[in-house]
Amino acid sequence: MGVTAEDFDRDCHTDLFITHLAAETNTLYRGAGDGWFSDATNVHGLGLASTPFTGFGTRWLDFDNDGDLDLYTVNGSVSRLQDQALQGVAYPLRQRNQFWVNEEGRYSLVMSSDKAVGRGLAIGDIDNDGDIDMLITNSHGRPQLLRNTTDTLGRDWIGIELNAPGALTLGSTVELGSQECVKAIVQTDGSYASASDHRVVFGISGNLLRTDVIVRWSDSSVEQFGRLKLNRYHSLRKGRGAPVPSDLELGAVHGVSQ
């Protein structure tokens, strides 16, 4: 039901993660860069533990700004769960959500403590503090706003908002010039029946004070914005960056400013 698209393994190719019904595993499709995808679900530890659950909203996000993309999945059954029905639960469809923490490419699972009939998941930085928060919608239940209070002391970040008057910014790609293949798609869609923050946030590794950012706009033009300070948001306006030849692939231009 749900889908999220990002380059989770930092190989410059977009990957897909899709949620499914109970008795099926959710699926991670690893992009090969030539229009083909391979099923990498079990290789990255995302298969067996998802089987008992019906997944809906899902998004990749770097919750602790360590530079790795973690994964959150909102679950809720569509068929009566017998144990809950016998207990007299009004809507016996409640399931726990799943938080998958990226540990060097393989995901370890943290289960939510509460059960709900989960459906939508939107992400964004609601308090502008540089880490990603989540909003979950539940059928027959209250929405849940989860404010990120993870200790990210010593980890830097940079946030980017694109501005292209008279043109769409959705579908554009933002890449850090200081780290090859660290990129994000500007998107509000995906997940399930949800719309997320259009800004992108990167966790920064290394002892940098500033970084360059490369933007491939939705019309395929490419610009480089130099020496942006860390630990703050920047609004990048189309036409004010340094032009980059449009046939140059993302990942080929990198500059480090300290």
Region spans (language model):
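Hydrophobic beta-strand segments that make up the repeating blades of beta-propeller
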Residues: 11, 15-20, 59, 71-75, ...
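Short consensus segments that form the blades of beta-propeller domains
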Residues: 18-20, 48-51, 86-91, 165
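Short glycine/acidic-enriched loop and turn motifs that connect beta-strands
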Residues: 23-25, 78-80, 141-142
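Short, conserved, GDST-rich strand-edge loop motifs in beta-rich repeat architectures
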Residues: 74-92
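Gly/Ser/Thr/Pro-enriched helix-cap/hinge segments flanking short amphipathic alpha-helices
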Residues: 93-95, 102-258
